């Protein structure tokens, strides 16, 4: 999808503006080192291809569900609740992270989806579910943090493989990031970047 020069210039201006403001904002508050594995309870998916049913209730989150814009791609894959899938049904505010990439460039590896509703999605193999510790962290904030380029850069560096790369959760769960422990500040940061995302999406839609 092509974005016009005018829209591109506007978007770049917004990014520069927030990049300029954001450092002064974040360093005025308390940030702590936190390991990826400490933000919530993590569990890996299994192969559920045998359960695929075109008339199923649940949307399936698999490697093809992740996009470079961090939005869910509906591939039309469905399952029902069965003995095999029932433990992999996601809850609202869960995060899912893709641990594989179909290419060596790492366009989607480490990207995260924020689940927006209860009892609607099931996660497949190659995805790690993170049940956020909501006493400490806001899921919307972690969604923005984990999809940031500098966050994903660490994950890409930890990847293995050649034509198709992958990471092990056990390895990347030890990666440390600076995170504010103030939920009020988490909320403000999440809102800033959610607004930026919305503006970018709006400008892209205007190209059609």
Describe the residue ranges of each PLM region.
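Feature detects amphipathic, helix-rich regulatory segments
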Residues: 1-208
């Amino acid at each position: 999808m092509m974005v016009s020069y005018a829209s591109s210039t506007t978007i770049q201006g917004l990014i520069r503006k927030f990049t300029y403001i954001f450092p002064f904002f974040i360093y005025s508050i308390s940030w702590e080192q936190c390991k990826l594995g400490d933000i919530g309870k993590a569990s890996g998916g299994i192969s559920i291809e045998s359960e695929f049913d075109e008339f199923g209730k649940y949307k399936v989150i698999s490697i093809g569900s992740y996009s470079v814009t961090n939005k869910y791609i509906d591939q039309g894959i469905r399952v029902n609740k069965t003995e095999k899938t029932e433990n992999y049904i996601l809850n609202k505010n869960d995060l899912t992270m893709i641990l594989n990439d179909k290419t060596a460039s790492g366009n989607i590896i480490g990207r995260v989806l924020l689940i927006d509703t209860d009892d609607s999605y099931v996660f497949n193999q190659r995805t790690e579910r993170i049940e956020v510790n909501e006493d400490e962290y806001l899921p919307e904030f972690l969604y923005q943090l984990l999809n940031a380029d500098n966050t994903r850069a660490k994950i890409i560096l930890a990847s293995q493989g050649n034509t198709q790369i992958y990471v092990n959760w056990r390895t990347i769960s030890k990666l440390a990031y600076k995170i504010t422990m103030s939920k009020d500040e988490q909320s403000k940061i999440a809102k800033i970047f959610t607004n930026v995302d919305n503006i970018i999406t709006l400008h892209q839609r205007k190209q059609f």
